[in-house]
């Protein structure tokens, strides 16, 4: 019986040793797994924080860029408004020329157009006093003296604020103040911008 007791005791001791070994191994495995998971969680945390910081920087840069673009666009719009106002004031000044200066503008412009003498000068109703019958007769006489037909006529139905349109057989040459300023605007806008904003 003592052999049986010894055998039982040996089995129990071996089982106890195996249990301790298994528990120690399980504890080591547990610690390894926990350490690995903790390290992974720490790495994930760092990665998430890094990504969040990068996204925050990108978002911040985008917001700043959009704000700068918006300010730039507002400034450009304001500059364009000022430049448009300058050109509109130029049109107003032309509309307020004295009768003598206005006639000089019309005569010098007509001289540069090489008239045939059969054209129609389209003006607005407001300018009919400047383009009187005497003015028209003098213009036609001058054309006749140059060997051209002297039969220019007036049409007072223009829907513009100043200047004139010359109609030559259905082809219209626009010499209104608006057309004059608009044709020069492309050339002058850069210079006006320099004068106003530099």
UniProtKB/Swiss-Prot annotation:
Keywords: ATP synthesis, Hydrogen ion transport, Ion transport, Transport. One of its GO terms (molecular function) is proton-transporting ATP synthase activity, rotational mechanism. InterPro entries: ATPase_E_C, ATPase_V1_Esu. It comes from the Bacteria. One of its GO terms (cellular component) is proton-transporting two-sector ATPase complex, catalytic domain. SUPFAM superfamilies: V-type ATPase subunit E-like (SSF160527). Transmembrane segments: none annotated. It holds the Pfam family vATP-synt_E. One of its GO terms (biological process) is proton motive force-driven plasma membrane ATP synthesis. The keyword Glycoprotein does not apply. Belongs to the V-ATPase E subunit family. Produces ATP from ADP in the presence of a proton gradient across the membrane. This is V-type ATP synthase subunit E. It comes from Clostridium perfringens (strain 13 / Type A).
